Design a protein with these regions (language model features):
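Boundary/linker segments flanking structured domains
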Residues: 1-92, 96-177
Length: 177
């Protein structure tokens, strides 16, 4: 359940830069904006074309592309916790990480060629593609973060409670201590 800001009465308070979900207060990280061409359209990348596919692997379900590139501020290096991606103020994805900067700068925001193929990180491809699609549809894409060591439990709880459209699993319940 998402609550209104008690101070300003907004669900996603632009004044507090906070988002309250259940009893957790997430801090605003950034607006996700892909790298752009001079005409304002997102640059498209096809990293799978750079992969030396010696084992003749097939592309994974989300590996075809195109993909985009984006990053977040380096100050989020080594920040452990739970993040949410909102598209036009709807929570579309909940995830956990042990380093938010790496998750977005080197995971979702910069697709490595190997991840496009079977056995690679297909989630990175899927989330990047979803972000690119949302951006091309002129939707607002925001990232919020909750710093916590209880990331597996909170991620699982929120995915179950929110039924987010981009999550394909319920997190990692086996890692909940």
């Amino acid at each position: 359940m998402v609550f209104l800001c008690k101070l300003h009465k907004y669900q996603f308070c632009i004044f507090c830069f906070r988002l309250k979900i259940n009893n957790y207060e997430f801090d605003f990280v950034c607006q996700i904006t892909p790298e752009l061409e001079t005409d304002g359209t997102p640059k498209k990348f096809f990293p799978q074309e750079r992969y030396d596919n010696k084992k003749n692997l097939n592309l994974n379900k989300y590996g075809k592309g195109p993909f985009c590139k984006f990053s977040i501020d380096r100050k989020y290096s080594l920040k452990t916790g739970v993040y949410v991606i909102l598209v036009d103020d709807l929570i579309e994805y909940v995830g956990e990480c042990d380093d938010l900067f790496k998750r977005f700068g080197m995971g979702y925001g910069n697709i490595s060629p190997r991840n496009c193929f079977e056995g690679g990180q297909s989630t990175n491809c899927r989330i990047n593609s979803n972000i690119l699609t949302a951006f091309k549809l002129k939707k607002s894409i925001q990232l919020y973060f909750l710093e916590t060591n209880d990331r597996f439990r909170i991620e699982h709880e929120l995915i179950i409670n929110l039924s987010t459209s981009w999550n394909k699993t319920s997190g990692k319940p086996s890692k909940i201590s």
